[in-house]
Amino acid sequence: MKFELDTTDGRARRGRLIFERGTVETPAFMPVGTYGTVKGMTPEEVRATGADILLGNTFHLWLRPGEEIMRKHGDLHDFMNWQRPILTDSGGFQVFSLGDIRKITEEGVHFRSPINGEKIFLDPEKSMQIQHALGSDVVMIFDECTPYPATEDEARKSMQMSLRWAKRSRDEFDRLENPNSLFGIIQGSVYEDLRDESLKGLVEIGFDGYAVGGLAVGEPKEDMHRILEHVCPQIPADKPRYLMGVGKPEDLVEGVRRGIDMFDCVMPTRNARNGHLFTSEGVIKIRNARHRDDTSPLDPKCDCYTCKNYSRAYLYHLDRCNEILGARLNTIHNLRYYQMLMEGLRGAIETGTLDAFVKDFYTSQGREVPELVD
């Protein structure tokens, strides 16, 4: 992987990630394909929304279908017929989400399979091996996602163990002679000094990119912004910056304003299946009866297949009838909305008009622009 940085506007960055399987324009949003599919979408449909790269879930793909079946197909690209770049998370967040059915030790994590209750062990080495089998273009280190809230002492212990796991991840990645890229993950909860210590340790180990983890886990939005404003300027400028698991459209805008290059989130797809549709004027809840006889498109500013061909009334009808097509059309729209937002942000950075773009984004939704800390 090669990262090129073209231009900046304030702290925002316009560039690209160059892989053998294709180029990813940044800032970029990655749709989430947890089980090797963006729910309800074919790879061609996902690509048509403007997506350059997908995220796959190491933990879930390890449990089902497993490494053996993946290797029989070649790798995840061949298994799901997506021949463009794929980033896989390490499984750390999913293990964190298991709650009481997992036990974290220095060696790794013991847990019971949420599928059949089988006892399973996952550690940094195994995570690297699974991601190698998946053929991930971007591999994430195995870390512990610090819960929120956490005391500073709890956050410190978690972060320091994640640093030790980062070194083990790096060593195993190198032992496997994996030709792809490995990203470190900055932890430290809402404590700036711990974030500093985490980043310093990761840079000493050396990675191809740096992710900000442990945010969007319940902390106030102000804390997320504060941590990003503190951490981003310290990340090596020649490396991509990835904000994990984020987020709402306004979170993408605010992340870009603070120097983030990459995002992922299930929100556009999950919300689509629940009838919450993102538009240039805010969220439309298509299940609301007001849309029953509305012949207008979801968003006249959107160029997606759904908006060009169907009315709000039709989408309301499909949802009321529990038709699969409704969830698919909603997903196409939400994914395209996210990609159009990223296209707009990239264009604004290129032309030095990011402030105007951000103001218009919030004004069109009747909201105030959040302030940046100098």
Swiss-Prot record:
Task: Kindly list the positions annotated as binding substrate.
Answer: D89, S90, G91, G92, F93, D143, Q187, G214
Q: Which reaction does it catalyse?
A: 7-aminomethyl-7-carbaguanine + guanosine(34) in tRNA = 7-aminomethyl-7-carbaguanosine(34) in tRNA + guanine
Give the Enzyme Commission number. 2.4.2.29
Write out the ranges of the annotated region (RNA binding).
Answer: 245-251, 269-273
The cofactor note from the UniProt entry for this protein is:
Binds 1 zinc ion per subunit.
GO BP terms? queuosine biosynthetic process; tRNA wobble guanine modification; tRNA-guanine transglycosylation
Under which pathway is this protein filed? tRNA modification; tRNA-queuosine biosynthesis
Q: Which GO terms describe its molecular function?
A: metal ion binding; tRNA-guanosine(34) queuine transglycosylase activity
Report keywords, A-Z.
Glycosyltransferase, Metal-binding, Queuosine biosynthesis, Transferase, tRNA processing, Zinc
- Active-site residues per Swiss-Prot or TrEMBL entry: D89, D264
Entry's Gene Ontology cellular component terms: cytosol
The role this protein plays is:
Catalyzes the base-exchange of a guanine (G) residue with the queuine precursor 7-aminomethyl-7-deazaguanine (PreQ1) at position 34 (anticodon wobble position) in tRNAs with GU(N) anticodons (tRNA-Asp, -Asn, -His and -Tyr). Catalysis occurs through a double-displacement mechanism. The nucleophile active site attacks the C1' of nucleotide 34 to detach the guanine base from the RNA, forming a covalent enzyme-RNA intermediate. The proton acceptor active site deprotonates the incoming PreQ1, allowing a nucleophilic attack on the C1' of the ribose to form the product.
Record note on quaternary structure: Homodimer. Within each dimer, one monomer is responsible for RNA recognition and catalysis, while the other monomer binds to the replacement base PreQ1.
Q: Supply the name of the protein.
A: Queuine tRNA-ribosyltransferase
Organism annotation: Shewanella sp. (strain ANA-3)
- Gene symbol? tgt
